[in-house]
């Protein structure tokens, strides 16, 4: 009876992991252990330390789809001070350069780029420009899948970048509000009436009024910027459900995310965030 009691948390862990749709590998990487070790824990072949047990429970809790908030990286731009693009692919990205599509043109005045899906790497033989990695929203999600297959996470990747003396040009952190905790029109109203106490001296509020129809909710399509868009740090808060409605035609009541709160960091601010 005591043995069953001791193992009850393992049964609950396995049950919740499966109900959340989380693989052993994904939970193991998030918890800082190997997949075989987690498999042995779930099968009762080994007893984890209290530290490992807590790491597993904390990591699984973050994957709970019923959590009202979750956080992710939504934009990453990093420059590497080298012209050895093959080395960056091999030592930092851990991707096979032969699988990338190569084009003889680039962006940000780079002469060429490599692409796999939405993962973009700009290259130049000019050392002052170096190698530039850009991951937008979809690119971040795609790269996360590669990190998972590599048994790495964002922390491991950023550590490898720092070892290469990389320069963090921009980093966007997004917090998804799944239940409508934030009332963006109300926040915009309070900013306008100077009821918002903040170190930031400016704000901007945009509303996609031309896309609002009579049968839709009032004040939808709001985007609120707090801080100067030219500064190294500012906030962007917008109605994600409305964005998906406009882009994809997803009904508002079927949206997984109601609002999104983004922290946009550039240069030194991005570096210190890492």
Language-model segment annotations:
Residues 1-3, 32:
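Short Lys/Arg-rich cationic patches that frequently serve as NLS/NoLS or arginine-rich RNA/DNA-binding motifs
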Residues 3-8, 12-19, 62-274:
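Structured, helix-rich domain cores that form ligand/interaction pockets
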Residues 17, 28, 57:
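The alpha-helix within a helix-turn-helix
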Residues 21-40:
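Short alpha-helical DNA-recognition segment
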Residues 43:
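Short, conserved catalytic or interaction motifs in soluble domains
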Residues 49-65:
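DNA major-groove recognition helix of helix-turn-helix/homeodomain DNA-binding modules
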């Amino acid at each position: 009876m005591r043995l069953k009691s001791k193992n009850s948390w393992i049964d609950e862990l396995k049950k919740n992991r499966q109900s959340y749709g989380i693989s052993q590998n994904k939970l193991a990487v998030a918890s800082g252990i190997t997949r075989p070790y987690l498999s042995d824990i779930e099968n009762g072949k080994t007893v984890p330390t209290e530290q490992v047990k807590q790491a597993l429970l904390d990591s699984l809790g973050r994957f709970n789809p019923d959590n009202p908030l979750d956080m992710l990286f939504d934009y990453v731009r990093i420059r590497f001070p080298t012209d050895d693009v093959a080395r960056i692919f091999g030592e930092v990205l851990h991707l096979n350069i032969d699988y990338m599509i190569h084009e003889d043109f680039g962006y940000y005045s780079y002469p060429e780029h490599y692409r796999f899906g939405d993962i973009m790497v700009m290259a130049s033989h000019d050392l002052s420009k170096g190698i530039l990695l850009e991951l937008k929203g979809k690119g971040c999600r795609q790269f996360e899948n590669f990190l998972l297959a590599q048994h790495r996470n964002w922390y491991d990747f950023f550590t490898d970048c720092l070892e290469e003396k990389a320069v963090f040009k921009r980093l966007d952190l997004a917090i998804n509000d799944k239940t409508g905790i934030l009332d963006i029109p109300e926040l915009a109203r309070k900013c306008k009436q100077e009821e918002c106490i903040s170190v930031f001296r400016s704000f901007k509020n945009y509303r996609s009024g031309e896309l609002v129809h009579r049968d839709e909710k009032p004040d939808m399509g709001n985007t609120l910027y707090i801080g100067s868009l030219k500064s190294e740090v500012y906030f962007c808060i917008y109605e994600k459900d409305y964005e998906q409605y406009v882009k994809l035609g997803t009904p508002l009541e079927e949206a997984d995310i109601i609002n999104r709160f983004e922290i946009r960091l550039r240069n030194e601010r991005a570096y210190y965030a890492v």
